[in-house]
């Protein structure tokens, strides 16, 4: 039986994002990274100092992952770049891999490293209203950026990995699809046995960004419905958390004990009824009563350009 709750929350920073995405907790830094895709901004919040650094970028950043040499691996419009903040507040950008999208009007969207340090990233056509199935899922590892591992996505999203690293989750958050799948993920990075995990047409919200907790349960942001949904590994809904924002975009576990859940959000074109418009675009912090897993840094550090 699923339980619905309205959790207590904190607002991480007064900053508001146009399209806040890709929250990423760094255990080594005890800091939260995230991006504003349309604001073209990279952020890092130092929890101990309660300060937020920000760096503007020339291109949209779809998502980020920790980089083994410090900073982050960023999936940008033209490809993957290693972004490394300097001592004087500048941001160095080193190209790592070139994007080969199916069309020129595309960008990377959602991404995350698996337990072996391979970076997985999806793509999408910029104009969602076209419902164009040219998006794909790629893998970046020591051999470079792969050919598409999954094709015919409209808005690839919801990437997450089981605690043992043997299952990959992927969703398509477009309103005409709204489904989550899981795959068997093998030691060599190959995928097999695609099957439906959850039909989100049966639940509130579109399946946006996701995370997996230490129990192996899958947390997904219900965009447009203002909820966080937790599914067991068998695909059963067991918790619903009601949020004060209508468009939660992605969640990530963090904090010293990995018992906090950070949630980024999107500022809607028009305020949604029943929600607190002053929090649109905010980054929230909840304590869901379960712990997450540390994020793995991308192990592939050599450029493939």
Labelled PLM ranges:
Residues 8-14, 50-56, 94-101, 145-151, ...:
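A short beta-strand motif characteristic of beta-propeller blades
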Residues 15-29, 58-73, 101-118, 150-167, ...:
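Beta-rich, blade/repeat-based domains predominating
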Residues 33-35, 74, 120-123, 169-170, ...:
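Residue position within the beta-strands of beta-propeller blades
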Residues 37-38, 128-134, 173-178, 223-224, ...:
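Short, solvent-exposed loop/turn segments at conserved positions within beta-propeller repeat blades
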Residues 41-43, 79, 135-138, 179-181, ...:
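A short loop-to-beta-strand structural motif that recurs across blades of beta-propeller domains
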Residues 84-89, 182-190, 288-293:
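Short loop/turn segments immediately following beta-strands, especially the blade-tip
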Residues 90-151:
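Hydrophobic alpha-helical segments and helix pairs
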Residues 253-305:
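Blade-level signature of beta-propeller repeat domains, shared across WD40, Kelch, NHL, RCC1
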